């Protein structure tokens, strides 16, 4: 059985003090029944050591990693630096990185491979824009992303997140059955039954139970709703 993964992406939010306060409120809210679920907190670089140092029912993830181990890459971070901070997971290819920082499928692939070379588990993000969706080519677009992003990547040490870009931070939510259909298509295309496939896009307490009841959705990648302890705890404690 594939494990359930609940990942919070804090993006560029939370100072160290705010992260500490979040943990104090969040950890006691996790129900004992959630122990078979993998909870991941992907904080900003400045909070990663703090998240690792605190005892809690969660793993630590980063939001970016470079394709090189060292070099003149101002502002970037190498995988071994993340490992030293107690990081186990890293988001790669998020739509915001692709849009604002010009990441391409080629650089995403290089980041994925280097992360795995250092025993990090990447969370690969793929998804379509509103225009791609309206043109009816969502599946073709995502298959193309997967083919280019996953070259030489070890599927046994990978998580894939489907994030319809039109639903990120917009309040629009992809219908659960449609999200499940796309996740099933992704699983079939990568031809590896064991890879966890998450849904990301305006996930909130109000829709988590319906999303997690879907057969091909193994978890969620949560943005805004992961910033508040009570909200994210309800997501982690989903009921199906």
Swiss-Prot record:
Pathway in which the depicted protein is active: Carbohydrate biosynthesis; gluconeogenesis; Carbohydrate degradation; glycolysis; D-glyceraldehyde 3-phosphate from glycerone phosphate: step 1/1
GO molecular function: triose-phosphate isomerase activity
Predominant subcellular localization, coarse grouping: cytoplasm
Amino acids binding substrate: 9-11, 169, 202, 223-224
Matching PROSITE patterns: TIM_1, TIM_2
A Pfam family that the UniProt record links to this protein: TIM
Subunit structure: Homodimer.
Protein name: Triosephosphate isomerase
Organism taxonomic ancestry: Bacteria, Bacillati, Cyanobacteriota, Cyanophyceae, Gloeobacterales
